Amino acid sequence: MKKTPLLNVALSRLIASLGHGDVVVIGDAGLPVPPGVELIDLALTHGVPDFVSTLKVVLSEMQVESHALAKEIFDKQPTALSTLDELNDEGSLGRRDLLSHEQFKVLSRQARAIVRTGECQPYCNIVLVAGVTF
């Protein structure tokens, strides 16, 4: 059995296969998945798993160069934003880009995969751009 926090097979496979610049989206339960983009559906029920816990586990294994958020998170999700700011201050998220929610959905078309959580708070979505460890 793995010793690291991430146990989901599909998510482990995805992270292990990422190259520099590849895009992964972690989204709430309502984020649309564009045709042709892989869906890794972790959602069990409302709030399980939640956005922040899922993000922290992904960050335990993924090197991130930059991330993007929808601007709406500032008004709608101050608690989630506070956690994202802490992770950003730790250096876990790299450069931050802010987009409209519509621009965010367009960018998600480039994702290698979208990870759907059970989060039911709006705008709890993030685009992660893979970095390198060297």
UniProtKB/Swiss-Prot annotation:
<protein>
    <recommendedName>
        <fullName>D-ribose pyranase</fullName>
        <ecNumber>5.4.99.62</ecNumber>
    </recommendedName>
</protein>
<dbReference type="GO" id="GO:0005829">
    <property type="term" value="C:cytosol"/>
</dbReference>
<feature type="active site" description="Proton donor">
    <location>
        <position position="20"/>
    </location>
</feature>
<dbReference type="GO" id="GO:0019303">
    <property type="term" value="P:D-ribose catabolic process"/>
</dbReference>
<keyword id="KW-0413">Isomerase</keyword>
<feature type="binding site">
    <location>
        <position position="101"/>
    </location>
    <ligand>
        <name>substrate</name>
    </ligand>
</feature>
<dbReference type="GO" id="GO:0016872">
    <property type="term" value="F:intramolecular lyase activity"/>
</dbReference>
<dbReference type="InterPro" id="IPR023064">
    <property type="entry name" value="D-ribose_pyranase"/>
</dbReference>
<keyword id="KW-0119">Carbohydrate metabolism</keyword>
<feature type="binding site">
    <location>
        <begin position="123"/>
        <end position="125"/>
    </location>
    <ligand>
        <name>substrate</name>
    </ligand>
</feature>
<comment type="similarity">
    <text>Belongs to the RbsD / FucU family. RbsD subfamily.</text>
</comment>
<dbReference type="InterPro" id="IPR023750">
    <property type="entry name" value="RbsD-like_sf"/>
</dbReference>
<comment type="function">
    <text>Catalyzes the interconversion of beta-pyran and beta-furan forms of D-ribose.</text>
</comment>
<dbReference type="GO" id="GO:0062193">
    <property type="term" value="F:D-ribose pyranase activity"/>
</dbReference>
<dbReference type="InterPro" id="IPR007721">
    <property type="entry name" value="RbsD_FucU"/>
</dbReference>
<dbReference type="Pfam" id="PF05025">
    <property type="entry name" value="RbsD_FucU"/>
</dbReference>
<feature type="binding site">
    <location>
        <position position="28"/>
    </location>
    <ligand>
        <name>substrate</name>
    </ligand>
</feature>
<comment type="pathway">
    <text>Carbohydrate metabolism; D-ribose degradation; D-ribose 5-phosphate from beta-D-ribopyranose: step 1/2.</text>
</comment>
<keyword id="KW-0963">Cytoplasm</keyword>
<comment type="subunit">
    <text>Homodecamer.</text>
</comment>
<dbReference type="GO" id="GO:0048029">
    <property type="term" value="F:monosaccharide binding"/>
</dbReference>
